[in-house]
């Protein structure tokens, strides 16, 4: 169970990404991951395998979860089998999932915020 009310996602192999940012922080409102303009975390890989809406991140009863949207392919924690559609998995910091050709890691949201602050300081 995650004790914070935010969770971060970082793309591990950002060189395979053609759009979007390398990191994102979800709060208790949750959101969607995909290539569509209406997604909360908008990304696309070089092979354009990421659907308009590919995954749903939710927050319920003190835990964040992830689920595949409709028939989208998500591979969780290096599994060779894709997640069943509509099946929610409780997220833990350090978990890895793959969408298209991109590999993501769930991280502490504070580490993303600290990294952003450090980069801003470097640019000034």
PLM region spans:
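Intrinsically disordered, low-complexity acidic Ser/Thr-rich regulatory segments
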Residues: 1-46, 96-97, 101, 110-124
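Forkhead-associated
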Residues: 25-100
């Amino acid at each position: 169970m995650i004790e914070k009310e935010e969770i971060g996602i970082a793309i591990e192999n950002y060189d395979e990404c053609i759009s979007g940012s390398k990191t994102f922080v979800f709060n208790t409102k949750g959101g969607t991951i995909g290539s569509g303009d209406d997604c909360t975390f908008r990304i696309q890989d070089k092979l354009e395998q990421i659907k308009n809406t590919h995954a749903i991140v939710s927050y319920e009863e003190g835990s964040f979860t992830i689920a595949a949207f409709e028939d989208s392919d998500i591979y969780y924690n290096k599994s060779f089998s894709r997640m069943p559609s509509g099946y929610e998995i409780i997220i833990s910091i350090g978990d890895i999932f793959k969408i298209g050709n991109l590999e993501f890691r769930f991280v502490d949201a504070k580490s993303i915020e600290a990294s952003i602050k450090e980069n801003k300081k470097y640019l000034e």
